[in-house]
Amino acid sequence: MSITEKQRQQQAELHKKLWSIANDLRGNMDASEFRNYILGLVFYRFLSEKAEQEYADALSGENITYQEAWADEEYREDLKAELIDQVGYFIEPQDLFSAMIREIETQDFDIEHLATAIRKVETSTLGEESENDFIGLFSDMDLSSTRLGNNVKERTALISKVMVNLDDLPFVHSDMEIDMLGDAYEFLIGRFAATAGKKAGEFYTPQQVSKILAKIVTDGKDKLRHVYDPTCGSGSLLLRVGKETQVYRYFGQERNNTTYNLARMNMLLHDVRYENFDIRNDDTLENPAFLGHTFDAVIANPPYSAKWTADSKFENDERFSGYGKLAPKSKADFAFIQHMVHYLDDEGTMAVVLPHGVLFRGAAEGVIRRYLIEKKNYLEAVIGLPANIFYGTSIPTCILVFKKCRQQDDNVLFIDASNDFEKGKNQNHLSDAQVERIIDTYKRKETIDKYSYSATLQEIADNDYNLNIPRYVDTFEEEAPIDLDQVQQDLKNIDKEIAEIEQEINAYLKELGVLKDE
């Protein structure tokens, strides 16, 4: 459903206030540091309000408050069991965000209380199905850091200010056309990415690119059993797929521990139940999770041209063994492609963003590329994107689409969208219309002059499996023919104008006595 202008204004106002609150924490910290605190506090407020709602539902009709019920041992154990079943954790009454706000108002709050409370959330899940989704979730929010203040009093004062300001914000996460809280969290992640420089690519894919990837892997699907991102970052790309169609389960792997925590928070905050997502913290290529599984949709924006070991052991790894070559140590791009293809279901769709080098580099990469096209016929489309649309890098990128269910005579679609963008101050952007043009062209699989081309497998073979887009999409603009007669006439007119101007100048000089008659 489209959002109203009023809701759009509410969003903008909420975003403005959130970023102002985030700046209260800035101090001597860089963006990657104070990001952990502001996102952690927003998330803790969410957990608290979620728990309060569950407690209210569980006690409806009981004529007893949550605090009173918790004081009764029998009620308390029933409430714990109910909360664990419904949301995967529980929070004691005195540890709720709202309870701490009351402590701040009476000047009874201590930052140590918050530190203890977040540890208790994690330990409440021990031995439960939700344990892996919560353990270590707040490990990057170091409330004892001197960056927050030199002593407990200073740290308490700063965190109290942030908590009070957050408490004033209208986070509503039910009965709304738009997920205000989820949207606010995505806004914060995006803003932090914009200030994080080269590190931004580790955890965030711009929303318009995410939209393209998500629309591609959900094309023709009214639901997906599962979607998998092997380099899931903050989880935003996975969640974007859920905005396009119904997704039952989300799977991801992320090497960076801080980003892994962010992804789990993002899932929970978007009301994905703990049993409906599985995010793992490890190196995808070296220690892959989910072996033996395949997925309806596989989607990723992996680190570009990253290094990997390319160890000889991988020659017998079922992800890579059929290709005859391993991706080079200095560029893991094709290792990620091979990994993703291995996890793709026979009827699924895969979309991955990578630098243009994967289209034409030779040696081992050329062998792998040829195998995927000639032997397997998995390549569905190549989409060239504009330069400078990603955080942290200005290089042009492309989207590769793969399917295992292609027919032998299916063509491969090439789209050159490299010149379709809105120029920004520091970064280029894709408009909604430009995104829709890409998606519409992909769905129609049509050839459009100077924009797209549907190539046969034989044409690709004739190009020696080089996928460089200009080989297939001719964007050359012919210059208008030059009318030499008109050019000659223009030159005569210019000479005439020069002569007239010289006469005027000479006349003025004579009046001034500078130039005498000859």
Please annotate each region the language model reported:
Residues 399, 403-438:
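Conserved P-loop NTPase
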Residues 1-212, 216-217, 275-284, 289, ...:
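Non-catalytic, mostly N-terminal accessory regions of nucleic-acid modification and defense proteins
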Residues 17, 24, 33-46, 328-402:
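Conserved Class I SAM-dependent methyltransferase catalytic core
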